[in-house]
């Protein structure tokens, strides 16, 4: 393996069902039916509406080939949780579609560790998905719930409203461009910005408080 560039391709050692069972199956408590059937079954609380968001991450465009698997698992879920937060939704469940060049067990364990750690923090359950062979590609669909009529929407802004920003704008993009070499950044600031690119923090609680 080239030490200057971590490869996510090692060897095909697992079949699809074993891969799902080992890394992406856990008991569900909030979903009626989770991983293992043709569809998941969810039961939102009375008086709630569902919010659904999907995001795809592609190697080289959304994350670096050198990213640690744990950080990639975190980021894949975090970007979807951020969309739920933007609507003020409470996270419920998510699905994961994962294309892999090879079933690298070390990569999969790290990816799953990062994914599950964030999922447990926000009480969101993995209820389904798909795996296939192909270039590394990750797609998560997250589902949340919000009291009927209370979802935060972009169309809700009016002239004269205050605009509040949490966090720092542009850090993740600056890090990505810096590592690509398209933005000239010194080493220390670039290393500091890398956390924003690889470990974004979804503002789930803040989103619910803003409803």
Question: Where do the language-model regions lie?
Answer:
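Helix-biased detector of long, well-ordered alpha-helical tracts
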Residues: 1-211
